[in-house]
């Protein structure tokens, strides 16, 4: 792959990942796959005790600390859900980029890699994006 074309996999991954998330938001039914996620979401919105926890047993401090700050600033926003969706969007984008680069490195066209990325997002990425879970 030429240096000039290095941005093409990133842009393609960005567009495909954004299109996937837009399609899910428009036509899909986003829900939590496990009840653990709902409990975490509610705790970081202040349900139950009325206080937002400083730490959570299931979350790494690098995730729980910003969630606490965001929850204190605007508790009505489901920050845990938005964080999960943003990380899924990023993972889908990087997956498409990696597939395109692998195809290009082996002498195939990037368009074939983009088609493989679209298939990957359709068959695997959509499942995790529709049934959000922190354990996936």
Please place each PLM-identified region on the residue numbering.
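N-terminal membrane topogenic signal
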Residues: 1-15, 107-108
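Transmembrane-helix motifs of polytopic, lipid-linked glycan transferases
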Residues: 86-106
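Short hydrophobic/aromatic helix or loop-helix immediately within or flanking a transmembrane segment
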Residues: 53-78, 82-86
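Specific aromatic-rich, kink-prone transmembrane helix
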Residues: 45, 94, 135-136
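Extracytoplasmic loop-helix module adjacent to an early transmembrane segment
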Residues: 9-56, 68-72
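Aromatic- and kink-enriched transmembrane "portal" helix at the membrane-lumen/periplasm boundary
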Residues: 114-136
């Amino acid at each position: 792959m030429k240096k000039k074309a290095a941005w093409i996999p990133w842009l393609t991954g960005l567009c495909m990942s954004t299109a996937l998330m837009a399609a899910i938001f428009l036509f899909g039914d986003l829900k939590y796959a496990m009840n653990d996620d709902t409990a975490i979401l509610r705790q970081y919105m202040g349900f139950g005790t009325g206080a937002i926890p400083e730490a959570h047993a299931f979350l790494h401090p690098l995730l729980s600390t910003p969630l606490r700050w965001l929850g204190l600033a605007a508790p009505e926003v489901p920050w845990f859900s938005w964080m999960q969706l943003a990380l899924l969007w990023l993972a889908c984008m990087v997956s498409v980029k990696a597939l395109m680069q692998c195809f290009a490195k082996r002498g195939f066209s990037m368009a074939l890699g983009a088609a493989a990325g679209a298939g990957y997002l359709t068959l695997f990425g959509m499942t995790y994006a529709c049934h959000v879970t922190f354990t996936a």
